Amino acid sequence: MPILFIILFLLVIWAAFLGKAGEGYSNLLLNFDLKQLTNPTNIRLAFSQAFFSLSLGIGVMITYASYLNKKSNLPKQAIQISFLDTLVGLMAGLITFPIIYTFNMSSSISESTIGTLFTTIPTGLGQYGLIGRVMAILFFGLAYIAAITSMVSLLEIPVSTLIDKFNLKRKYASIYSFLIIFA
């Protein structure tokens, strides 16, 4: 989704010029404390995020790896995927925290920041009329497409199992898996 990445990049630049961007960066995002790297809660949360965002707990990466050819450089690809996943998360923070401080939204953040991006982006972009609304629609539309296409990968595990165990064609294995999961 290069277009979504480009929109994220543009939003990072836009957020950097908001009135209280520096305050948002220094207070919430770039306030680095080395002691927190040894905090067991933070370590658990970091692993939880990695397992969630890379779908490691349900075997998606293992299933994808089974389709790679023998010459694939797995360590290099793992580093690239991890880097891009971290970069997108950092970009989301670089967008979210300036909006929180500029538009006084600190009270809307709970202990869990899940969904914060989805409340701050509309608020921040809503202040900029039609252009802001168009950017919000593009962002959320592309985020929706990215989420749906990522969900398709979750079907690959039962589909590949049905193909391997019962020698089904991919089309029928996909239909059966879809019906069992979503019916």
Language-model regions, residue ranges each:
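Membrane-embedded translocation segments of transport machinery
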Residues: P2-I148, V152, F166, Y172-A173, ...
